């Protein structure tokens, strides 16, 4: 057993996990800066309704990403993290699913655009083709299994810059059509997937794999795919409620707050993405519990403290996009509460994948959707965009608690329960300290 393997077996977090996470967070900082710049440019170029429409379709495309991915990346890691000889056949199976699912997403988008009789609908449908190229992104699986993220992060940074460059060119040209801004963003993502494949080719098996040899791949991927769709649904379905009850302009304000939240959860997203191969190997070695107990509480507490410190300043942050965006300040406060919950929930849901509890992940996400829709039916008409944010917070708390319950029922210990109180306590302490600073103490 190697030294690194001994560390993994003892539940310690390998250095490669932290290096990979740090690289991804740095890349995400750049990507977030590009996204915020895109939103700032679009908010200036488009009228209130146009900007709301732009952010609506950005949210829809995020949902289409999950349609195209359909859980294939996670199952590919499940099957190859400890068995790299299966790489060729696994990639063949996963790519076939992604292409078909991506094209199905295009049909869904086209039907939606036709039903709404959208202006420039053809450009929107053209932009919706980019998720099909996620089949190329699977070429990074060998690097993910090796916890090596330098090339994928660099390529994603280039793709974000291309999207920003496209939007900047449209802004400089005085374009005021939301669909063309969507197309500019989608083009950057497409180029990024192509570059990821080209940069990762030398790590791929030379032989062609046979998808048929990976029996049951789609059956294993489907629960995870639907689970991811449910997660995207309860994250973005509030757009439909806000548009219907509040209008497109408040929707634009709300979606900027959601984008800030998306930026705030990046460490959770990329930590869980990085640790999945390691957690899978830990589970096979019978050491998943110590690994989770070592990684989770400190991450959760740090997230709570950071979100608490930001709570009094949400209005000032949103005002960077214009004074009118202060209307979403209270919404962002609720969303920061949701962020804290996500730092625990995302790790628990990743642990379920490591355990092979794919169906349990699906049930949790499906119940999250039902809870979210039920609360939105009441909260948005009663509280406006603040109600949508409150609903998101409640849903993420439910997902975190449900994930922890399933892990415990599987016989995996999460360590001392007191250590997991750091998230809410950090949120309260950070909010109190930051409020005192805001008052001049």
What does each of the following model-derived ranges do?
Residues 3, 13-73, 106-109, 163-164, ...:
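Signature of the first transmembrane helix
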Residues 33, 173, 368-371, 395, ...:
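Transmembrane alpha-helical segments of multi-pass transport proteins
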Residues 40-41, 51-69, 184, 238-240, ...:
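Alpha-helical transmembrane segments of polytopic membrane transporters and translocases
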Residues 113-127, 248, 310-340, 346, ...:
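Interfacial segments at transmembrane-helix termini and the short loops linking adjacent helices
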Residues 124-128, 153-203, 367-372, 385-407:
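Hydrophobic alpha-helical transmembrane segments
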């Amino acid at each position: 057993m190697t030294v690194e393997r001994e560390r993994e077996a003892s539940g310690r977090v390998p250095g490669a996990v932290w290096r990979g996470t740090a690289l991804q967070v740095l890349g995400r900082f750049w990507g977030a800066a590009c996204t915020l710049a895109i939103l700032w440019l679009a908010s200036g170029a488009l009228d209130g309704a146009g900007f709301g429409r732009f952010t609506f379709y950005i949210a829809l495309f995020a949902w289409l990403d999950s349609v195209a991915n359909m859980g294939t990346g996670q199952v590919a890691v499940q099957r190859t993290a400890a068995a790299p000889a299966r790489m060729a056949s696994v990639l063949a199976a996963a790519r076939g699913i992604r292409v078909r699912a991506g094209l199905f997403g295009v049909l869904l988008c086209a039907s939606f655009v036709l039903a709404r009789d959208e202006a420039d609908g053809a450009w929107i449908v053209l932009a919706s083709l980019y998720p099909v190229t996620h089949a190329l992104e699977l070429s990074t699986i060998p690097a993910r299994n090796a916890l090596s993220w330098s090339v994928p992060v660099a390529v994603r940074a280039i793709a974000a810059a291309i999207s920003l460059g496209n939007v900047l060119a449209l802004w400089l040209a005085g374009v005021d059509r939301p669909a063309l801004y969507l197309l500019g963003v989608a083009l950057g993502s497409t180029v990024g997937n192509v570059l990821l494949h080209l940069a990762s080719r030398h790590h791929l098996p030379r032989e062609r794999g046979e998808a048929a040899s990976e029996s049951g791949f789609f059956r294993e991927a489907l629960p995870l795919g639907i689970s991811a769709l449910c997660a995207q649904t309860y994250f973005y379905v509030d757009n439909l409620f806000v548009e219907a009850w509040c209008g497109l302009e408040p929707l634009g304000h709300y979606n900027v707050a959601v984008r800030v939240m998306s930026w705030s959860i990046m460490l959770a997203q990329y930590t869980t993405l990085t640790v999945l191969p390691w957690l899978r190997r830990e589970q096979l070695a019978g050491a998943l519990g110590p690994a989770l107990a070592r990684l989770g509480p400190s991450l959760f507490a740090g997230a709570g403290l950071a979100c608490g410190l930001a709570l009094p300043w949400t209005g000032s942050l949103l005002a960077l996009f214009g004074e009118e965006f202060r209307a979403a300040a209270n919404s962002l406060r609720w969303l920061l509460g949701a962020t804290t919950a996500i730092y625990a929930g995302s790790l628990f849901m990743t642990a379920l994948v490591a355990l092979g509890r794919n169906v349990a992940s699906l049930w949790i996400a499906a119940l999250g959707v039902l809870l979210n829709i039920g609360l939105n039916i009441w909260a948005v008409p009663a509280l406006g965009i603040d109600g949508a944010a409150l609903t998101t917070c409640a849903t993420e708390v439910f997902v975190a608690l449900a994930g922890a319950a399933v892990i415990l029922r599987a016989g995996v210990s999460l360590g001392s329960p007191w250590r997991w109180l750091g998230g809410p306590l950090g949120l309260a302490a950070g909010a109190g300290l930051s409020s005192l600073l805001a008052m001049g103490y």
